[in-house]
């Protein structure tokens, strides 16, 4: 095995670990959400996340927390609160695999928001595949079905929140340290969550606290896995593997919750996956052309 192939496989391995962690988060959130309110889950998740990040703050020094954009961190925290509480609540009323397929639609929302907030010019083929992608989202959510539950739209609200976070990250992440972005967002989200969580408070059991700690620490762990992966392979090289998360979710949901995706979820995935792949690769080409022209 040559060095290039070894580096590629190692990078993909790190990326797959991030997918496993992400699926585990959804499973844990769904399990916790059956008893604890999504506001309380969000509070503990980000409270523990901020605790886990403290050793890194000490290691890198207090200068790593210096920021010239406090309002950006507050905005990220508010979006995280809204996104994660909506996502956790959605998991309590819909299968894990439905959540996974909806998460694949986030690049579609990001593309639209980029037009308004980043002044990006979008070529017409990307608009076409975006429309097709949203058709896939409609197929997944089945708003036309007799048993349609409108509360499943919380997933869509969460996806929009996460897309807005992507826009903010694109604009500001290169100007702030990663530790400060993670730490301040976790602190703000925990603070915002606490007052509303107290209205629905149920004291977690020891086992639930352990799961909440795992949930809080895994967010940073996912980022670590992704950074390791992207240090070895290009982000577009990992794109096709992103959709293995659906396979992981199907297996986990079946064995833990006895869930299996319905035909609409699978049909929606078949539509959404190629459209988002097209967007990812076309964005990469656009970035390459931009760098070549500079």
Swiss-Prot record:
Residues 21-141, 160-280 form the EamA domain. One of its GO terms (biological process) is amino acid transport. One of its GO terms (cellular component) is plasma membrane. It is a multi-pass membrane protein. Keywords: Amino-acid transport, Cell inner membrane, Cell membrane, Membrane, Repeat, Transmembrane, Transmembrane helix, Transport. The chain crosses the membrane at residues 8-28, 41-61, 74-91, 98-118, 121-141, 148-168, 177-197, 207-227, 237-257, 260-280. InterPro entries: EamA_dom. It is found in: Cell inner membrane. It comes from the Bacteria. Pfam families: EamA. Belongs to the drug/metabolite transporter (DMT) superfamily. 10 TMS drug/metabolite exporter (DME) (TC 2.A.7.3) family. Transports S-adenosylmethionine. This is S-adenosylmethionine uptake transporter. It comes from Rickettsia conorii (strain ATCC VR-613 / Malish 7). The lineage of its organism: Bacteria, Pseudomonadati, Pseudomonadota, Alphaproteobacteria, Rickettsiales. The gene is sam.
């Amino acid at each position: 095995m040559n060095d290039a192939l070894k580096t590629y496989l190692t990078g993909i391995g790190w990326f797959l670990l991030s997918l496993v962690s992400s699926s585990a988060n959804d499973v844990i959130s769904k399990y916790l959400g059956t008893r604890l309110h999504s506001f309380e889950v969000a509070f503990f998740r980000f409270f523990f996340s901020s605790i886990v990040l403290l050793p890194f703050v000490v290691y890198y020094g207090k200068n790593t927390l210096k920021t010239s954009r406090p309002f950006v961190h507050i905005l990220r925290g508010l979006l995280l609160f809204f996104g994660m509480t909506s996502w956790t609540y959605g998991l309590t009323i819909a299968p894990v695999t439905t959540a996974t397929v909806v998460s694949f639609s986030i690049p579609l929302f990001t593309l639209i928001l980029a037009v308004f907030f980043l002044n990006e010019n979008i070529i017409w083929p990307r608009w076409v595949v975006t429309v097709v992608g949203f058709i896939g989202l409609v197929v997944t959510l089945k708003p036309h079905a007799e048993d349609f539950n409108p509360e499943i739209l919380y997933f869509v609200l969460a996806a929009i929140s996460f897309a807005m976070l992507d826009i903010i990250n694109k604009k500001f992440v290169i100007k702030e340290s990663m530790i400060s972005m993670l730490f301040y967002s976790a602190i703000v989200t925990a603070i915002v969550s606490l007052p509303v969580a107290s209205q629905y408070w149920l004291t977690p059991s020891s086992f639930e606290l352990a799961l909440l700690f795992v949930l809080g620490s895994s967010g940073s762990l996912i980022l670590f896995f992704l950074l390791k992966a992207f240090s070895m392979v290009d982000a577009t090289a990992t794109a096709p593997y992103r959709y293995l998360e659906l396979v992981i979710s199907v297996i986990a949901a079946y064995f833990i919750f006895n869930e299996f995706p319905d035909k609409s979820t699978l049909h929606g995935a078949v539509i959404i996956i190629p459209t988002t792949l097209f967007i990812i690769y076309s964005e990469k080409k656009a970035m390459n052309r931009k760098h070549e022209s500079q």
